Swiss-Prot record:
It comes from Paraburkholderia xenovorans (strain LB400). The record marks R161, K217 as: Positions MEP for the nucleophilic attack. Belongs to the IspD/TarI cytidylyltransferase family. IspD subfamily. The keyword Acyltransferase does not apply. This is 2-C-methyl-D-erythritol 4-phosphate cytidylyltransferase. The record marks R17, K24 as: Transition state stabilizer. It is an enzyme of class 2 (transferase). GO terms for biological process: isopentenyl diphosphate biosynthetic process, methylerythritol 4-phosphate pathway. Keywords: Isoprene biosynthesis, Nucleotidyltransferase, Transferase.
Length: 237
């Protein structure tokens, strides 16, 4: 049986670093809620069986009417961490007929620059892989490590950037493998910040697939202006 594709977008975070009272996934960017752009990108990929959005149980900001015409489902099963929300989402995918051998692409709602072309590039690179992998970019900037004992932000040393990549999303893995990896990490007392870290914790080596600068993560207040500029122009294939 051919493995199917599912998308999972954890949306239970509060976006505290963005400096806004409203979670950043619902902030307006280029005339739309930020979440809209990720949903639209996956909706344009008809090969996906379902896109599932996981929100906090007490989320008062989500309004499905703002995403009219897009194909997705919602579950109010967000956890206290990203890892917990993703795990709950993996369990919920079974409601839509997902099996352990099917693929899931986990994507940050705060990366509105994702495009159908990027999604298909990732799927094409990984659909026959034994482990899976992630979108990522080679680190371009010089990296400095801060002196932990410095009160005014002094540099302790410069880190070599050779071989370093910056993780992006989507991150694509088999549902069964990712669930097992997260459960192992939880059992070992580790709350990991992305899915690849959990797969690594299980002893596997995910593959890196070249991403795009437009697929950056909106994190700080000034990032919204950059996202506005990017999303106001058509994506270049």
């Amino acid at each position: 049986m051919t493995s199917r594709l599912f998308a999972l977008i954890p949306c239970a975070g509060t976006g505290s670093r963005s400096g806004a009272a409203m979670p950043k996934q619902y902030r307006t960017v280029a005339g739309r809620d930020m979440l809209h752009f990720s949903l639209a990108a996956f909706d344009a990929c008809s090969e996906f069986a379902q896109t599932l959005v996981v929100i906090a149980p007490d989320d008062a900001h989500f309004d499905a009417r703002r995403f009219g015409g897009l194909r997705f489902a919602v579950r109010r099963s967000g956890g206290a961490s990203r890892q917990a929300s993703v795990l709950n989402g993996l369990h919920a995918l079974a409601e839509f007929g997902a099996h352990d051998d099917d693929w899931v692409l986990v994507h940050d709602a705060a990366r509105p620059g994702i495009t159908p072309a990027l999604i298909r590039t990732l799927v094409g690179a990984l659909k026959d892989d034994t482990v899976g992998g992630i979108m990522a970019l080679p680190v371009a900037d010089t990296l400095k490590r801060i002196d932990a004992n410095s009160a005014d932000g002094r540099i302790a040393r410069t880190e070599a950037r050779d071989g370093l990549w910056q993780a992006q999303t989507p991150q694509m893995f088999r549902i069964g493998m990712l669930r097992a990896a997260i459960l192992r990490a939880q059992a070992d007392g580790h709350d990991l910040t992305d899915e690849a870290s959990a797969i690594e914790w299980l002893g596997h080596a995910p593959k890196l697939v070249q991403g795009s600068l437009r697929n950056f993560k909106v994190t700080y207040p000034e990032d919204f202006d950059l996202a506005e500029a990017i999303l106001s122009r058509p994506a270049v294939s």
